[in-house]
Amino acid sequence: MSAPELSAIEVAAALERGELAAVDVREPAEWDAGHIAGALWIPMGELAERVSELPQGRLAIVCRSGARSGVVADWLERSGVDAVNLAGGMQAWHAASLPIEPVDGWIA
């Protein structure tokens, strides 16, 4: 089973409507360079031990390119969590000129 994928535009619209929550599975330096506002940050390597922190409802899983988030979204789907992969990851988010939230007010 493969988790469904949504485009950056589709994820942004669903976030705006409150239909899903974003979970960013990137590493610290990637997160610090900018992330989706309101996203929960749990690096991929910590997810298994922190799965209880995931919000209820549909989740959009985010990484840099969509590869790691695809693996995580598939794993979550197999575990009974309603998860989608952000197709193209933050690269697609940037390409669509969608807003990011910098850490400490600046982008690395």
Regions from the language model: what does each represent?
Residues 1-21, 27-59, 67-108:
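Rhodanese-like catalytic fold shared by cysteine-dependent sulfurtransferases
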Residues 62:
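Short, surface-exposed ligand- or partner-binding patches at beta-edge/loop junctions that are enriched
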